[in-house]
Regions:
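Bacterial N-terminal signal peptides that target proteins for export
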Residues: 1-13
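Active-site-flanking beta-strand signature of metal-NTP-handling nucleotidyl enzymes
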Residues: 38-46, 91, 148-154
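Bacterial N-terminal signal peptides
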Residues: 11-21
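A structural feature that tracks compact, well-ordered secondary-structure segments
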Residues: 44-45, 58, 62-66, 76-79, ...
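An amphipathic, aromatic/His-enriched active-site/gating alpha helix that lines ligand/cofactor pockets
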Residues: 61-77, 93-127, 176-183, 202-238
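Solvent-exposed, non-transmembrane alpha-helical starts
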Residues: 52-56, 101-104, 161-167, 212
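Glycine-rich beta-strand-turn "strand-cap" elements at beta-sheet edges
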Residues: 29-37, 77-86, 111-149, 157, ...
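Structural beta->alpha junctions
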Residues: 46-50, 94-95, 154-159, 203-204
């Protein structure tokens, strides 16, 4: 009986150890999933005169195939300057560095880079951003002619960084959660210049955007931050191609 008791004790200890290790592995896996920092880039590109259609074609191929075939490519958006159709912007979000490297090695990206010299001018500006808040609705965007895109660049005054972040982050979270017309909000700070924020937003319509501006949470944000801000730059953009996976949620404060 003593032998059986000892054997039972050993078996229970082994089982306890196995369950403990499994729990640790699950926690570790969860931490790996939530701790990954997305790659967030905005590109400003000059398009040669008469090459707008060629740019749209190669860009559509790159965007569509990447969103469809690459699990880590979360959002790719092409927009144009309303007043200068030869000035284009690409907004790209990847799950992590590995996902971005996968995209750079893809055939559709290589096709884009091979055709770029005959389509683009020498004006190529990459804005590398530290993701602060990245969110979109649970389903992929189904683009239509009513949708609008906004991009704003804001310089936060020195010493106001923490207060500004504390004000703007909950406003973005609430906007996406409670407003049907807010389809995506992507916000980040410029790498090397953390006082510079860029916001890219997609709305279901102009009326949805105007309704957003009247919400209590947006008005609260305006009143809280009006003394914190320096220069603001508003980009006058129109959507060209909007593609995303849907269900993106990254909050640097969580």
């Amino acid at each position: 009986m003593k032998f059986l008791h000892n054997q039972y004790t050993i078996t229970m200890l082994i089982l306890f150890f196995a369950l403990t290790m499994l729990a640790v592995e699950r926690v570790h896996a969860k931490e790996q999933k939530t701790s990954a920092i997305p790659v967030f880039n905005i590109f400003e590109l000059g398009v040669q005169a008469g090459k707008a259609a060629a740019y749209d074609t190669v860009g559509e191929n790159n965007i569509t195939r990447s969103i469809t075939n690459e699990p880590g490519t979360l959002s790719m958006v092409s927009v144009k300057d309303k007043e200068n159709p030869n000035l284009a912007y690409m907004i790209e979000i990847y799950a992590d560095d590995a996902a971005y490297r996968t995209h750079l090695a893809s055939p559709q990206y290589k096709a884009f880079t091979e055709q770029a010299p005959s389509i683009l001018t020498d004006h190529k500006l990459r804005l590398s951003l530290t993701a602060q808040y990245l969110g979109d609705k649970g389903s992929p965007i189904k683009q239509n002619g009513e949708m609008i895109t906004n991009m704003v660049r804001i310089n936060v005054l020195p010493g106001e960084e923490a207060a500004f972040k504390a004000a703007v982050m909950p406003e973005m979270v609430q906007s996406l959660a409670v407003e049907d017309g807010v389809l995506a909000i992507y916000a980040g700070t410029l790498v090397g210049a953390p006082n510079t924020w860029l916001f890219f937003e997609i709305y279901a319509s102009e009326s949805a955007y105007q309704a957003h501006r009247q919400t209590p949470h947006f008005q609260k944000y305006l009143s809280q931050t009006q003394q914190m801000l320096g220069e603001k730059t508003f980009y006058n953009l129109r959507p060209a191609l909007l593609k995303n996976k849907g269900g993106l949620h990254f909050n640097s404060m969580e």
